Amino acid sequence: MIEKIDHIAMVVRDLDRAVEIYAKGLGLEAERIEQSDEFQVRMAFIPVGDVHIELIEPIGPGRAQDFLEEHGEGMYHICYRVGDIEKAMKKFGSTLEFLDRKPRKGSAGALVAFLEPGSLFQVYTELAERKNEDLKQQDRA
């Protein structure tokens, strides 16, 4: 059901600065930057092997802004790739609580759903179904 870790997300106050730090400090370049009006965030995606680091800067009210205000910058969520998100939600929903009642459109054309943090040790957890293995090949959200 879970195929792999898709990405690890971190909330930052200044996305441009964070992208620069990853590039200069670790030699890791962002392959794309995009904005989600639905989630009220700007995001940068940095490939590390077959997993991505997602840097998230809140640009308005929402979960990411709430997290930043409560916890400061840092680890925000982990995302697991699933083959069929509706089946995964049905299977996992019998023991875990979802924040999303149905999948939503996420970055790069993925279908995504978030679990209630209390379900998995206070860690935001996202499930993502992607049609293509390569995140950068997806249609832009």
Language model features by range: what are they?
Residues I5, V12, Y22, I46, ...:
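Short, structured motif recognition centered on aromatic/hydrophobic residues
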Residues K4-D6, L28-Q40, I59-Y76, S94-V112:
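A cross-kingdom feature marking solvent-exposed beta-strand/loop segments within repeated
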Residues M1-V19, M75-V82, K131-A141:
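N-terminal beta-strand motif that seeds the catalytic metal site of vicinal oxygen chelate
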Residues A44-F45, M89-A141:
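Vicinal oxygen chelate
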Residues S36-V51:
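C-terminal "cap" of GNAT-fold acetyltransferases
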Residues E29, I53, R63-A64, Q122-V123, ...:
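Short loop/beta submotifs within extracellular cysteine-rich repeat domains
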Residues H71-G72, E86-K90:
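Long, charged/polar, surface-exposed segments that mediate recognition or autoinhibition
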Residues D16-E29, A88-S94:
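Amphipathic alpha-helical segments
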